[in-house]
Amino acid sequence: MLALLRPYLSTRVLCVLVVCFSALMLVAFIPTLFRNDTALQIRASRQGTTLPDGFYVYQRLNAEGIRIKSITPDNDSLVIRFDTEEQSMAAEKVLHQLLPYGFDIGQMDPSGSSQLMNRLSLRKQSVG
């Protein structure tokens, strides 16, 4: 009798494993897909002006109690990501006071492809 049930059990076990794996993947990717982070972009508005050091910006914003998700250079700008819109707005206000004239600081609208890649990224983002 066990010989008769063996093919049925293996197919059933396989189906259960596929369903469990699918459920696990769904649970893993749902938070990543619906993550809503905001970003600021700092650009030099004049030729010859160098961007501020990312670590300096991190230290100053951290001293103000603003939590930063990541700071990365992007072409000729510095992109700072935050978990919430409130953190981003507070950081923009602090950066306007902190950085001298000659820098454009503003909210960054993520493009469709980079936003999708950001949402699909499973790597933990870090500062630095």
From Swiss-Prot:
Instruction: Tell whether Cell membrane is among the UniProt keywords.
Output: yes
Alphabetical keyword list? Cell inner membrane, Cell membrane, Membrane, Transmembrane, Transmembrane helix
- Coarse class of the primary localization is membrane
Could you cite one Gene Ontology molecular function of this protein?
A: protein kinase binding
InterPro entries the UniProt entry points to: Modulator_MzrA, SecD-TM
Q: Does the keyword Lyase apply?
A: no
* Residues in the Periplasmic compartment per record: 35-128
Q: Looking at the UniProt record for this protein, which Gene Ontology cellular component terms does it annotate, in alphabetical order?
A: plasma membrane
Q: Which Pfam families match?
A: SecD-TM1
Topology versus the membrane, per the UniProt entry? Answer: Single-pass membrane protein
The residues exposed to the Cytoplasmic compartment are: 1-13
Compartment(s): Cell inner membrane
Would you say which domain of life the source belongs to? Bacteria
Transmembrane domains' residue ranges: 14-34
Assembly notes: Interacts with EnvZ.
What protein family does this chain belong to?
Answer: Belongs to the MzrA family.
What biological function has been recorded for the protein in this entry?
Answer: Modulates the activity of the EnvZ/OmpR two-component regulatory system, probably by directly modulating EnvZ enzymatic activity and increasing stability of phosphorylated OmpR.
Q: What is this protein called?
A: Modulator protein MzrA
Originating organism: Erwinia billingiae (strain Eb661)
